[in-house]
A protein has these predicted regions:
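Alpha-helical transmembrane segments of multi-pass integral membrane proteins
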Residues: 90, 792-807, 843
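Generic alpha-helical transmembrane segments
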Residues: 755, 834-849
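Membrane-water interface at loop-to-transmembrane-helix junctions
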Residues: 780-798, 826-836
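Transmembrane alpha-helix/helix-exit interface in multi-pass inner-membrane proteins
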Residues: 271, 764, 801-813
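Conserved cytosolic headpiece of P-type ATPases
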Residues: 1-777, 784-785, 798, 838, ...
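Helix-coil boundary and interhelical linker segments in multi-pass alpha-helical membrane proteins
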Residues: 722-743, 810-833
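A C-terminal functional module that forms or caps the active site or interfaces directly
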Residues: 852
Length: 930
């Protein structure tokens, strides 16, 4: 923006440029219509700074890595690894390195997920052109845009990008496309007269805004603001100040991490004291030795209780959701947003192109002699029928043909089919006129040859009409005028203007834009404004609108059925927004659209109230969109925001989930968003919501599967330190009795990371629950560790503990009794019992995974073989477990011992107990809920 300004220019910089006469603006900026001198421009450049947007760098690589490590559970693991290596140099080095390897793997996964962070500000800079045509020293020259300063006079022509914010003072039929900034669906016809001080951005028709595109005509304007002082710069500033909102899943996982960290710390300290006390009282060791051995036990518990595999499981589940969403035309840029969609309570949608087709379409006609007609068909495809009073018209009347021909001749747009899709070249409004004519047999090219244009008076905002002179038939030449209905009607003598204007009001109430047409015979080759002043015959009205997508109505109905409110936030006019909102079922009964002018007068408390009862917002500016999203979030909503323009980027970033358009969306909006729709269709959002809910259900299944293992391992270790027999062990040359470990830290890591991930993965492929879109969104305040997950965790963990502890003690005592004949050492016997305990936990997980495939139904009801991935996972884990038990390298790493067939059968039977128990639990829960 401005680095430093003298007091006079500073005062001028705060003026509402659009509300003042252009000469006053030039005077306030100490500028003239001939532009600045080179010396004056150089001085101002030193004061104002370059006309560039501030760049704010994203997070560095090291910051991203630190973000993955700075997690309570990760610090527990790192601390455990360090302590293990210090306390027990023999086995502790191996255990510590394995634990650190797990930390590194988790860090790599998280870093890869977040590395492609949004770079929206760089894309904003790309919207500004590199060079501009500027008047310096009274001459037009090409200058780098960065050198523009307030007071420079800029020349604009069709195809130019506006290089800074300009107050226009001279123009000829200038039209500028501002959709990316304002949401206006058609190019804006510019003028030079002042407008109201409180006019919204889209109504400041005497301004040209940086980054917008000139589509027609020429103009001159004086630079009022540059760099971050422009409207584009304000968005840049808002985008830099807007922080990404944490997703419900990330919040929930963080809370789980805190709960687990505190719980693990408390239990580990308790084990440290109990273990040390037992070692000293029953084992006869000193305090230091007892403490050292108890520390190993506490570390083992910490490693066992931490769900190291959970981040990988969550990432895999979300990644599968990404693939499914991509197949449904929603490309996910940020993984956690997959789950967030499932808990969305409000969707704030732009209108143009998302809820509507972004293709202006003539939908109604009015003829002075025969009344109103309806035109069927939407978009630019020239297919549709004519109807009147509810019945189809088989033969198109002559007066209708004359009106449609006038629309085709008095415009410059063309229509053609490219790659199977009908497209226009030119103004969208004129494209609608050409399409309407083509629908009923008026071929544009032939008509324009048969009625060749001889002269044109282009549209001027001061005149509010366009006129064309054409070769006629035997009766001579004719003039056609097209423009604002009231302006056209004043020039006609064959019509009741009040009746026609009532029809204009009726069409406008439906949100349609109305153009009037008139003709008169003429006998001269040239065309002047005086020739167009009177004597016309009123041909009729053509009313058009950017129509709603037909499929969106069903999609919005599905959202309502799923408990999701849909709000339309658009830069378009109030009447159009209200009409579209009512057609789509968005507008609440009796509630009118709220305008940006009204929003600007509200404080935060008023905004929080207005968003409760109103669903349609029109003529909104970027800060209004941002304020509405924040108000909804303050009211406790999980908000999804759709958009395609630069003006949407701050709100996209602020919302819980930003959804950008892939076809019409700017790069700024795409990079600020979490999800990009490849078809720009609202129905894809509904499909993505359904997929998000399925992902969340499957994450709950994964949590219900993983957490019992961690709690069970903790219970096993707690039971062991309190009740297991002590074993003889040589420490520093002295025979003492030491605590008996049912599992080693490395074995616990095997269960948690390798085996658990292998079995939890199939749960991510489970089909959606039957009621997925017939229930309200999940309360964002509801913890992931809800009553169901907690109860299921304790139930399953208790069963797992009983099986693993029972079989460990059975195998240990059985082998100890037969050690004389077996020849096994006590260390080998302990290793065999530990291997059997691990295998029992693995078999428990195999059968428990089958139970977790559905939240409410038995595995036999949903179909045992309905998810083939389950059995791929089972096969993989059994193969890995066989290597764990019998492969010499694995035996060396994990200190395992080969098991007999009898031991394997017993482990499988103990694990299978969970299947009938959980089936009964589901049955009881379903009956109590009914």
């Amino acid at each position: 923006m401005v680095n430093s300004l003298d007091s006079g220019l500073l005062e001028a910089a705060n003026l509402p440029w659009h509300s003042r006469a252009s000469d006053d603006v030039l005077s306030a900026l100490s500028a003239t219509r001939e532009g600045l001198t080179t010396d004056e421009a150089r001085k101002r450049l030193a004061q104002y700074g370059a006309n560039v947007l501030d760049k704010k760098g994203g997070a560095s690589v090291m910051a991203l890595i630190w973000g993955q490590i700075n997690n309570p559970l990760i610090w527990v693991l790192i601390g455990s690894a360090v302590i293990a290596m210090l306390v027990d140099p023999a086995d502790g080095i191996k255990n510590g390195l394995v634990i650190l390897a797990v930390v590194i793997i988790n860090t790599i996964i998280g870093f890869a997920q977040e590395y492609k962070a949004s770079k929206a500000i760089e894309s904003l800079s790309a919207m500004v052109p590199e060079f501009a045509t500027v008047q310096r020293n009274g001459k037009r020259v090409q200058l780098p845009v960065a050198e523009l300063v307030p007071g420079d006079v800029v020349f604009l022509q069709s195809g130019d990008k506006v290089p800074a914010d300009l107050r226009l003072f001279h123009l000829r039929t200038l039209q500028i496309e501002e959709a990316a900034l304002t949401g206006e669906s058609v190019p804006v016809e510019k003028m030079t007269d002042p407008v109201a001080e409180n006019a919204t951005l889209g109504d400041r028709r005497n301004m040209a805004f940086s980054g917008s595109l000139v589509t027609y005509g020429t103009g001159l304007g004086v630079v009022t603001t540059t760099g971050n002082g422009t409207e584009l710069g304000r968005i840049n500033t808002m985008l830099g100040e807007t922080t990404a909102v944490a997703t419900p899943l990330s919040i929930a996982l963080h809370k789980i991490g805190i709960v687990l960290t505190v719980g693990i710390a408390v239990i580990s300290v308790a084990i440290l004291f109990v273990g040390t006390a037992r070692a000293m009282s029953e084992g006869g060791v000193d305090l230091l030795t007892g403490l050292r051995e108890s520390v190993i036990f506490a570390i083992t518990l910490a490693v066992g209780a931490i769900p190291e595999g959970l981040p990988a499981i969550v990432t895999i589940a979300l990644a599968i959701g990404v693939q499914r969403m991509a197949a449904r035309r929603a490309v996910v840029r940020k993984l956690p947003s997959v789950e967030t969609l499932g808990s969305t309570t409000v969707i704030c949608s732009d209108k143009t192109g998302t809820l509507t087709r972004n293709e202006m379409t003539v939908q109604a006609l009015y003829l002075p002699g025969s009344g109103a007609y309806r035109v069927e068909g939407t978009g630019y495809e020239p297919v549709g029928r004519l109807s009147k009073d509810g019945g189809h018209v088989t033969a198109v009347p002559d007066d209708v043909q004359e009106l449609l021909l006038a629309g085709v001749l008095c415009c410059d747009a063309t229509l053609e089919c490219k790659d199977g899709r009908w497209q226009i070249t030119g103004d969208p409004t004129e494209g609608a006129l050409v399409t309407a004519g083509e629908k009923f047999g008026i071929h544009t090219a032939n008509a324009r040859v048969r009625h060749a244009r001889l002269d044109t008076i282009p549209f001027e905002s001061a005149n509010q009409f366009m006129a064309t002179l054409h070769e006629g038939d035997a009766e001579g030449m004719k003039i056609i005028i097209k423009g604002a209905p009231e302006v056209v009607l004043k020039r006609c003598g064959n019509v009741d203007p009040d009746m026609a204007l009532r029809q204009v009001e009726a069409f406008a109430a439906e949100g349609m834009r109305v153009l009037g047409f008139a003709e008169k015979r003429f006998d001269r080759a040239g065309l002047t404004l005086e020739d167009c002043a009177r004597g016309f015959e009123f041909t009729g009205l053509q009313a058009m609108i950017d129509p709603p997508r037909a499929e969106v109505i069903d999609a919005i109905r599905a959202c309502h059925q799923a408990g999701i409110t849909v709000k339309m936030i658009t830069g378009d006019h109030m009447g159009t927004a209200q009409a579209i909102g009512e057609q789509l079922g968005i507008a609440t009964h009796g509630a009118k659209a709220v305008t940006g002018v009204q929003l600007a007068e509200m404080d935060a408390a008023a905004l929080r109230e207005i968003v409760k009862d109103h669903n349609v917002f029109a003529r909104v500016a970027p800060e209004h969109k941002l304020g509405l999203v924040r108000a909804l979030q303050d009211n406790g909503h999980v908000t999804a925001m759709t958009g395609d323009g630069v003006n949407d980027a701050p709100a996209l970033k602020q919302s819980n989930i930003g959804v950008a358009m892939g076809i019409t969306g700017t790069s700024v909006s795409k990079e600020a968003a979490d999800i990009v729709l490849t078809d720009d269709n609202f129905t894809s959002i509904t499909a993505a919501v359904e997929e998000g809910r399925r992902v969340y259900d499957n994450l709950i299944k994964s949590l219900a599967f993983v957490l019992p293992t961690n709690l069970g391992l903790a219970l096993i270790l707690i039971y062991a330190v309190a009740f297991f027999p002590l074993v003889e062990k040589t420490i520093d040359g002295q025979m003492v009795k030491d605590l008996l470990l049912p599992m080693l830290p490395t074995q616990l890591l095997w269960i948690n990371l390798v085996a658990a991930v292998t079995r939890a993965l199939p749960l991510a492929f489970e089909a959606k629950e039957p009621d997925v879109m017939n229930r309200p969104p999940r309360d964002p305040k509801e913890p992931v560790l809800n009553r169901f997950v907690v109860f299921r965790t304790f139930l399953a963990a208790t069963l797992m503990t009983a099986g693993a502890v029972g079989l460990f003690l059975w195998r240990y005592e059985l082998e100890m009794a037969a050690r004389a004949s077996s020849g096994l050492t006590e260390a080998q016997i302990v290793s065999e019992a530990q291997t059997m305990a691990v295998t029992t936990v693995i078999m428990f997980q195999v059968f428990y995974m089958l139970s977790c495939r559905s939240l409410n139904d038995s595995v036999f009801r949903i179909g045992l073989f309905s998810n083939k991935t389950v059995f791929i996972g089972i096969g993989a884990v059994l193969a890995l477990q066989a290597l764990f038990i019998y492969a010499p390298p694995m035996q060396a790493i994990f200190s395992t011992f080969p098991l007999t067939a009898q031991s394997l059968v017993f482990s499988a039977l103990a694990g299978a107990i969970i299947l009938p128990v959980i089936s009964v639990e589901k049955l009881i829960r379903n009956r109590s809920r009914a």
